[in-house]
């Protein structure tokens, strides 16, 4: 083993940079993690719900007293009647206040939890490795963020409020009914038990259909996003008919599953709503007979009817709340699959010391016997890769498509979860560096540039928190170095011109050059260029290469923009000024040396040199 050793760290050293929900397979524990952060608001809301229901069951008692008072027909009871009426009016006004308060103290935390889960989801998605996105389409992820989190918000807001409301109402109201007439209360409970036995069976079917619909919605969202992203390809290949048929198929599947949910609800909900009418008929029939037999007063019967009416909303709401909880819990399970994803160990490290720039200045970057196999692969795509990049060097990597160039770049950037002991920055194992330090030291321009729907200026200065302090003259120099100054000057609003979604208003070469200008804006230790010149002509390529090589030299009292450069390409013309060139084939270094040596040695490099020279001539 070389002197470059990985620094041993205990498991306790691996702490999250950002506080995330605890890892658990129990979705109720995860839900509780968010709810308990708003315990004070929920506690006040629960008290408000209790007060609301206490007032609701108190008013019928005064109605009973008032009716019985009227039934007695005594003139002396007029003052007492007015007292009862004023009490009922006061209770009604108080109930309006506490009921409104209960909604505020439940709904506000629900919205806050929705926001927090979205933030946690986004943080987690930003930290996950590239292979996660290869398995999960963006449309699927968008569906989880939009639809599934909405279901969780409904649980934490309206759902919890109604759960406490229903529990309290179904406790207080039957108690008051029992006080009036135990026998009549038992008659009312029997149909309730029968109805809810049937409803419970319907809810099981409802949950299964909701889970299936959510999966169907994710597939539909994924296909829609993919189709819109590839709209130019679909139009150019006359694939609109195929795309439309595929969308209709997914949409019909979504409709079929939604109809199953509607059918189940149409069976469950009417049973709950018709229960109210059945209870009223039952109370009038049996209670009326009790009044005739003088076992019950008219006031008591009126109060009992009022109590049975108070049972109506909780009983109907129980079906809605059960549906809401089932749908929300299905969404929470989907969210949990993202939040519980394992992070690479390096992403859990605190910031490393010493800083990366010092590490690179000492010994550069070294790759030692690097092997890599994709998680679902059956063979290594990189095998026994060894090389070193010293400060001030230009290293070239050349190879045909599928030779492992991009995988190597992703490994150097740690977009892939590499094994410790394979890549070192100075004396430090790259696998144990924090992302913050690594991205400061190593900057990459990819072969597939991504531009935001923003201005040219904001795309170049993306993620640069110190942009306001950048000299405008330096910004223009960067545009010139990226061969963009003349073209940007012709844009309608110069650098303030909007580039459209994913840079749709620009050519492929312009996109790559904006991405290159973004990397040139601030100094770094190692600048990696992954096939960034593939969409430009040879004349522009020569200009860009000259400007790229200038990044290694201090200029106008400014430090060098990069200490070393790694150029990855399939063009031999990009390798002419490199200090050392690696030739990759099938994941292995099959040849290496200087440009002047490789063009004289039989092999892939010489073949590509002759082929590209003939093409250019």
Feature names for model-found ranges:
Residues 1-56, 71-87, 102-106, 110, ...:
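Membrane-integrated ABC transporters
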Residues 216, 239, 263, 311-340:
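Cytosolic ends of transmembrane helices, especially the final helix of ABC transmembrane type-1 domains
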Residues 17, 23, 106-110, 126-171, ...:
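Juxtamembrane loop-to-helix connectors within ABC transporter transmembrane domains
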Residues 356-617:
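ABC-type nucleotide-binding domain
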Residues 37, 41-54, 58, 91, ...:
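Transmembrane helices of ABC transporter permease
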Residues 40-65, 84, 88, 103-107, ...:
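Alpha-helical segments in transporter systems
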Residues 130-131, 147-156, 160, 164, ...:
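An intracellular "coupling" helix at the cytosolic face of ABC transporter transmembrane type-1 domains
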Residues 87-99, 192-196, 200, 265-279, ...:
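Hydrophobic alpha-helical segments in the permease module
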